[in-house]
Amino acid sequence: MKKEPFNPTIFYANPSFIRRYQSKYAKIFLPGETVLDVGCGSGIFLELLQERQVNGIGIDTSAEVLRDGIAKGLHIEHGDALSYLKKKKNLYDGIMLSHIIEHLHPPDLINLLELANKRLKPNGRVIVITPNFKDIDVATSTFWLDITHVRPYPLPLLKQLFEYSGFSVVSMGNDPDTGGGRPPYSRVLSFIRYIYRKIRFGQYSGKGDIFLIAKKIG
């Protein structure tokens, strides 16, 4: 297999941290429901769904990172979200978009949200998790470590895009469980940067990730 030119997983949080902070999102779904995890990677969120008897389906563009999930027997397919949702006519109870939207240009994100709306059952939910640019660590360092990142999406803009695409926003805000789990060099400086940003950059008051949960209208 040809080696991929860039492997962003070297900057990922450790699996136990991802599992810990994503567990609350898995609890949104009920046993027997079907959830599509876009950009599922090795399948951590799919495992959390499986533990709750929720039917999880994962897709990812990186054949390299999804091999572990396939080896675990998880339902994972290789492909990108836009092509997958155009071809698949299945209806889902939920769609998970964890650290996906920052890789998309605005027209592609709107296209993705409109396709997601078509593929969701009535009252189906979408969960978005994305970097928080009010975290100075994110804005000045970690966001730019991934060369596939296109742009950040702050919550007011996300809310507008979801409502434009036929969703009602249920909740949104800072994810209190993120902001840790990054590479050690980031954690060592976290306290110093926290004090500095409070003094020098008062507006950079966020931490870690932001989230938005939306429901299909109708």
Regions found by a protein language model. Give the residues of each.
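A C-terminal cap/extension of S-adenosyl-L-methionine-dependent methyltransferases
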Residues: 127, 160, 170-218
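Short alpha-helix
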Residues: 150-165
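Short catalytic/ligand-binding loop motif for oxyanion handling, primarily in non-cytosolic enzymes
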Residues: 45, 104, 135-138, 179-181
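Hydrophobic/aromatic residues located in beta-strands of well-ordered beta-sheets
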Residues: 56, 126-128
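A short glycine-rich, Lys/Arg-flanked "PGG" loop and its adjoining helix->strand segment in the class I
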Residues: 110-122
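Short, glycine-/aromatic-enriched active-site segment of Class I SAM-dependent methyltransferases
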Residues: 128-149
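Short catalytic micro-motifs in class I SAM-dependent methyltransferases
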Residues: 98-103
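Conserved N-terminal segment of class I S-adenosyl-L-methionine
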Residues: 1-90, 94-96, 108-113, 173-177, ...
